[in-house]
A protein has these predicted regions:
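N-terminal, immediately post-signal peptide pro-regions of secreted/luminal proteins
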Residues: 55-157
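Cleavable N-terminal signal peptides of Sec/SRP-targeted secreted and luminal proteins
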Residues: 33-54
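Extracellular/periplasmic metallocenter environments
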Residues: 298-300, 328-466, 643, 651-725, ...
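N-terminal, post-signal-peptide metal-ligating segments of extracellular/periplasmic oxidoreductases
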Residues: 142, 147-371, 376-391, 395-396, ...
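Asparagine-centered strand-capping/turn motif at beta-strand->loop junctions
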Residues: 294-298, 581-585, 692, 855-859
Length: 958
């Protein structure tokens, strides 16, 4: 079916017809505007193309979007649906339009996720419907047909992957629950050398990033019964090759050799080497600093190339294993020409958009810089995106920049060696679950997708927990000095004793040869074959474009990878367990639940709200902590409910409803959840599956019209198998008896994280999307997107196109998009000013002050917003009218699972999300969306704490 809507002006509304490709999507697509204007005062006017005949339906009620689309309660929706059934052929009107103006077909549908219905307001009045409709007109139409870049959407199309890798692997052919959950051991510290020892209280590491192979899919050493999962090896047709990854490990470690485990030389995980994906865990003690030499060792043979003295062909650089787009604002070590006015040759956006080089993948040495996410860290060690460095390779051209603009802020660090940077971490914050990952400007998504990431855990001395008033938590966790086998082999001295386990969840896709798949063209996001995306892209020498050729606005993959293994299984006792969960996906929001299944591999039955059916088959999560601390109360989380426990030994019978009946343990990218799971009372042989009921597309809230993840792939995450009838040796306190509190601001030990009572500044910050300023396109009947060379985006009326050289706005084509996702500064009403990475800094908190930041989300997606340096409290959310910027009468407080200290928060579409943070270290930091594809294309900007002199690059605008 075809439909779209946009606002032409205060007394005009125009609706038109455009294809809808997404299963379960609504009829309206904000990027679909084949326009035939109908003059009215916000009339509903749906124009149906039925051959050469048109049918118009008008009604004084607003256009039914979101939940009211197709079959909604309003008469207009029903009449629209009835008329839609009559439409069988649209070629008549399309041919007529094509004859009138060459190059124009139908409007392109590729907008946003359906379901921008505000998460905290499941019901709406008619007045609210009208306001919502007007808002959609302002933003360019109803949500409903954003394609979203899904591998699943390409399975029926021709191969869109790299030709040298072969076809993409169908995730449904991968056997599930035949590989063990790999529990990351603790990374060992470096041996102390006299020159580099530093203070004795400082934990010292030398951690390198190298290329190696990892067995992520079933096969190789996972076919070995030693892990206690398989009784006999899998047949050959259920095994897969290894995957080339980038990963971290101690620089002194040898090449992984898993030959004794049925693997091979060069294949991780291995007992002889701590190089692994994900990285082994870096354990830290509160108030004990940690010093890390981060080494870029991405060379041909890092095991033979001595990183301190690189010489010879073994030390030649390697190119990235993931396609890198050179047209973004990125590190640009090859110094492609940028805007001369900026006086920069690196860390900039190349300006010659017709240069064919910008359409090619970057093939030079790979830059890196590491960020400890959630760390209370000095700016020179925070992993600022312009503080990257290349490997000390022997064949890098002299024309390349070896380091980023700010690799040695303040001159405080000892970064005098190429290929290495020394970062120092205070660890002066409450015990928490942090993580570390790459943060290079414009290519974070590439580096993180390739593998380098790991847990960074802070504990109190003696293993205590900040904020635990009464009770004890499940343990033990993996201990320093234990290797892969001690941590992961079955037995009471191995994994069976562990009750605290970090779990990193990511989505990935693969070629049939086992290599990682990541899209190398924009057609992926449109779910088209590259030949069907017929528009100029950056790097086209004949036509100017502002659409990147390789970058995709979002990307969703079809294999769930947990701790570096596809769909693993973990055997548990009937006992209490503590899981430190991390959403490490690039774009995917997770909505996690626990479901008791029959063990046959069949999907977990769900009711219409996405709850396990029957309800007693769902196990609760007991969330005890968020990103930066324990919560003030244990929160029982079940699908549709989030109930704070009083801590007196009772679990309330009346549960507190969650923001949506479909909401379970919702986690945006980079959010963490510290949870307890109670397997006590479950019989031997019980199978508990961790499921994901989030969408396979960008998340905009729990709209019923948006489907949940594929039941055969991304809805399943991992399984827990109960293997004994009685628990063994765990004295953990049941969750209903635990008493927690937030870290006490009056405790002298917490002075560095004290929250001043006086708020000194309130900032309104905008979350935006931006369509092309150069390219107008239409969509043909087969879905192909075609350039309209005679049209240009109309700056007077955003979201529309006009004939070049004319003010006419009745053309069928529309601006192609999105070209970028942006941040901005809100004005007094609906005005906002976009801010780019290259712009002067406008956010300048004073040292030791507390500010309230309000994130106004004008876009169609939810965004996980991360602020470096600080912990913050989520204060409230409130809906706003995106036409008038008028706020709703009532705000809603943070949900119970957000009551602790956080560093990442979900900002929902059409809502203002309010947080409060204290800025206590001077210097240059960033804040950004943690959808990595957004972050890499302008949805990240710097901010500066303190005066302009506090750090290089703090060019603050008052």
């Amino acid at each position: 079916m075809w439909c779209t809507t946009r606002r032409l002006g205060p007394t005009q509304a125009a609706f038109s017809i455009t294809p809808s490709f997404r299963r379960g999507a609504g009829m309206c697509g904000p990027r679909s505007r084949s326009v035939l204007p109908v003059t009215s005062s916000w009339l509903l006017a749906a124009v149906y193309c039925c051959g050469a005949r048109t049918t118009t339906i008008s009604e004084a009620t607003p256009w039914p979007c979101g939940n009211d689309t197709l079959g909604g309660s309003k008469p207009g929706a029903a009449r629209f649906a009835a008329a839609a059934m009559e439409c069988e052929d649209t070629s008549g009107l399309l041919q007529q339009q094509h004859q009138q103006r060459s190059g124009i077909a139908t409007g392109h549908s590729g907008g946003g996720v359906s379901g921008h219905e505000l998460q905290h307001s499941p019901g709406r009045t008619e007045q609210e419907d009208e306001e919502k409709t007007k808002a959609e007109g302002r933003r360019g139409g109803c949500r409903g047909d954003r394609r979203g870049g899904r591998v699943a959407g390409l399975q029926s199309a021709a191969s869109v992957g790299r030709r040298d890798q072969g076809p993409i692997l169908d995730a449904k052919t991968i056997k599930k629950y035949v590989t063990p959950l790999v529990i990351p051991p603790v990374m060992r510290t470096a041996r102390c050398r006299t020159l580099f020892c530093g203070p004795r209280r400082v934990a010292k590491y030398e951690i390198a990033m190298r290329r190696f192979k990892q067995q992520i899919l079933p096969g190789a050493h996972w076919n070995n019964p030693i892990w206690g999962i398989l009784q006999e090896p899998l047949p050959e047709n259920h095994t897969f090759g290894s995957t080339e990854v980038f990963g971290y490990g101690p620089a002194a470690d040898p090449e992984p050799d898993s030959t004794a485990l049925n693997g091979s030389l060069g294949l991780a995980p291995a007992a002889n080497s701590q190089f692994n994906y994900p990285a082994y865990t870096v354990e830290n003690t509160r108030f004990k600093p940690t010093s890390v030499d981060w080494i870029n060792h991405l060379v041909e043979n890092p095991w033979k190339c001595k990183w301190r003295w690189p010489r010879g062909p073994d030390c030649n650089f390697i190119k990235h294993i993931i396609p890198v787009d050179q047209s973004l604002h990125w590190a640009n070590p090859g110094r492609l020409m940028c805007n001369p006015a900026l006086n920069k040759t690196i860390d900039c956006r190349p300006s010659n958009v017709t240069d064919p080089e910008l359409g090619r993948q970057y093939s030079g040495p790979v830059p890196m810089v590491v960020h400890v996410h959630g760390g209370h860290t000095d700016p020179e060690s925070d992993g600022y995106p312009e503080a990257w460095w290349l490997p000390a390779a022997s064949d890098i051209s002299e024309s390349f920049a070896r380091q980023g603009t700010l690799v040695n802020q303040f001159g405080r660090l000892t970064n005098f060696r190429l290929g290495v940077a020394n970062f120092r971490y205070r660890n002066d914050q409450p015990s928490a679950t942090l993580w570390f990952h790459d943060h290079t400007l414009g290519m974070t998504r590439n580096n993180v997708y390739a593998g380098p990431a790991g847990f960074w855990i802070i504990r109190e001395s003696g293993g205590r927990e900040t904020g635990l008033v009464r009770g004890s938590l499940p343990g033990p966790a993996p201990r320093p000095g234990e290797g892969l086998l001690e941590t992961n082999l079955p037995g009471k001295k191995g994994r069976d004793r562990l009750r605290e386990i970090p779990i990193l969840i990511q989505d990935r896709s693969f070629y049939e040869n086992g290599s990682l798949f990541y899209p190398d063209n924009r057609a992926f996001f449109e779910e088209l074959h590259p030949d069907q995306l017929q528009i100029p892209l950056i790097g086209n020498p004949e036509n100017v474009s502002d659409i990147p050729r390789i970058w995709n606005p979002e990307a969703f993959f079809d294999v769930m990878v947990v701790n570096g293994v596809s769909w693993p299984v973990h055997k548990v006792e009937p006992d209490l367990y503590r899981f430190r969960l991390l959403n490490g996906c690039g774009s995917r929001f997770l909505n996690l639940a626990l479901c008791v299944v029959d063990g046959s591999g069949a999907p977990c039955p769900l009711d219409s709200d996405g709850r396990p059916d029957p309800p007693e088959h769902e196990l609760s999560f007991y969330q005890i902590g968020a990103e930066q601390s324990l919560l003030p109360k244990v929160v029982e989380v079940r699908t549709g409910f989030k109930t704070a426990l009083p801590g007196n030994g009772f679990i309330p019978r009346h549960k507190r409803p969650a923001s949506s009946p479909r909401e379970a343990l919702l986690m945006g990218p980079s959010e963490r959840a510290d949870v307890l799971v109670d397997f006590r009372g479950l019989k031997k042989g019980t199978v508990v599956r961790l499921i994901n009921t989030g969408p396979d597309e960008p998340f905009g809230g729990f709209d019923p019209s948006v489907g949940i993840a594929d039941e055969n792939t991304t809805r399943q995450v991992m399984e827990f198998h109960v293997v004994h009838d009685t628990k063994v040796g765990n004295d953990a306190t049941p969750p209903e008896h635990l008493k927690l509190r937030l870290p006490d601001a009056n405790d002298p030990a917490n002075l560095v994280w004290r929250q001043p009572a006086v708020v000194t500044e309130r900032r309104d910050l905008a979350l935006l999307e931006e369509d092309s300023e150069e390219i107008c396109s239409t969509t043909e009947a087969d879905g192909a997107i075609v350039w309209d060379p005679e049209a240009e985006p109309n700056p007077e009326e955003p979201g529309t196109c006009r004939l070049k050289g004319s003010n006419a706005s009745t053309v069928v084509s529309k601006p192609f998009g999105p070209k970028a996702v942006l941040l901005g500064i809100n004005g007094s009403s609906v005005d906002f000013r976009r801010t780019l990475w290259e712009d002067p800094i406008v956010t300048n908190p004073k040292k030791d002050t507390t500010e309230i930041w309000e994130f106004w989300n004008w876009s169609e997606d939810s965004h996980p917003i991360h602020i470096h340096l600080v912990k913050f409290r989520v204060i409230s959310r409130i809906r706003f009218n995106t036409t008038t910027a008028m706020l709703a009468e009532k705000s809603e407080p943070a949900v119970p699972t957000e009551a602790g200290w956080k560093d990442t928060v979900i900002a929902y579409p059409g809502q203002v999300t309010k947080v409060a943070a204290t800025f206590d270290i001077e210097g240059l930091y960033v804040w950004h969306c943690h959808v990595l594809e957004h972050e890499d294309n302008e949805m990240m900007v710097p901010y500066c704490v303190g005066p302009k002199s506090s750090a290089p690059g703090c060019d603050v605008v008052p």
